[in-house]
């Protein structure tokens, strides 16, 4: 049976459509994503916690869903807004239709609305709080009340909500065209030990690090720095994640401690912002953020342009950079800061998503740079140990 659904924004704008997910309400910040594919990866990306995602591509659900394409163990998006849900999912890897998938994960979603109009509104007015409501459509006032009551993401620490509860090891590499996801590698076949902070980490980040020889120990967001240093890592990775970076004082404190050492540090998305804050810079809330797989970014060091995947609503304020931070990448859409490198430490970060999933892999060489820093750190450590042994 077809059920009606209603999306109401905090400014009172209403969109009437059809329910394609669970019954109930979904309240959060409404954003738009311009990716043409990868809706399952988007839904399971922890960075979308407390957000209602509008997908601008008109046909969503064409290839169904499957367990291998999930970026985490749960759906983190608060709700989903699309134009059209195809009747048939055509893909040999399909295990479950999108509508059934949403219902199983208790995600409220709406289809058959004018997503172009909604996107233009969000672009012009900025990201707005909103509410999708199913089953109580006669009370649009209730939906508006819920939308206005949502406090917004500014000041909201969500990393500690989506992080893993326990430390774990990750040894699995990337999916290949010859088959499905590969079996986990043997630890002895992975020469580099990297500790990855899970602020909402995506699985494809972990896979791409394993592809480059990293044996990963993934730790909860609030793990003290001294506990990590006891693990003797060759490198420290700061993951993506949702919410405002400024309230994550536990992370900033830990990163400051790591920067007192010579261990290489690499941050992505929220991790990029946290590295900047730990170095003395500031962050700001963006008007409507960057969400999509077609964002051009200029690499200032290589003087080239990369097409990147983006998903962030906060950014580092370039005017606040201290002297030991230099800009390495900038957005060609709005000029916002996209990459940083410490001038005094082996620490760097990128605002976009070099692992994509979904999106292009133009920025994937950033993982290679991390490995180069790790190799240099290990070489210097060996040299130091040798000189000490001869004293």
Swiss-Prot record:
The active site is at residues 269, 353, 355. GO terms for biological process: 'de novo' pyrimidine nucleobase biosynthetic process; 'de novo' UMP biosynthetic process; glutamine metabolic process; L-arginine biosynthetic process. The keyword DNA damage does not apply. Belongs to the CarA family. CDD domains: GATase1_CPSase. It holds the Pfam family GATase. SMART domains: CPSase_sm_chain (SM01097). It catalyses: hydrogencarbonate + L-glutamine + 2 ATP + H2O = carbamoyl phosphate + L-glutamate + 2 ADP + phosphate + 2 H(+). Residues 193-380 form the Glutamine amidotransferase type-1 domain. GO terms for cellular component: carbamoyl-phosphate synthase complex; cytoplasm. Residues 1-189 are annotated as: CPSase. SUPFAM superfamilies: Carbamoyl phosphate synthetase, small subunit N-terminal domain, Class I glutamine amidotransferase-like. Pathway: Amino-acid biosynthesis; L-arginine biosynthesis; carbamoyl phosphate from bicarbonate: step 1/1; Pyrimidine metabolism; UMP biosynthesis via de novo pathway; (S)-dihydroorotate from bicarbonate: step 1/3. One of its GO terms (molecular function) is glutaminase activity. L-glutamine binds at residues 47, 241, 243, 270, 273, 311, 313-314. Keywords: Amino-acid biosynthesis, Arginine biosynthesis, ATP-binding, Glutamine amidotransferase, Ligase, Nucleotide-binding, Pyrimidine biosynthesis. Its EC number is 6.3.5.5. InterPro entries: Anth_synth/Amidotransfase, CarbamoylP_synth_ssu, CarbamoylP_synth_ssu_N, CarbP_synth_ssu_N_sf, Class_I_gatase-like, CPSase_GATase1, GATASE. This is Carbamoyl phosphate synthase small chain.
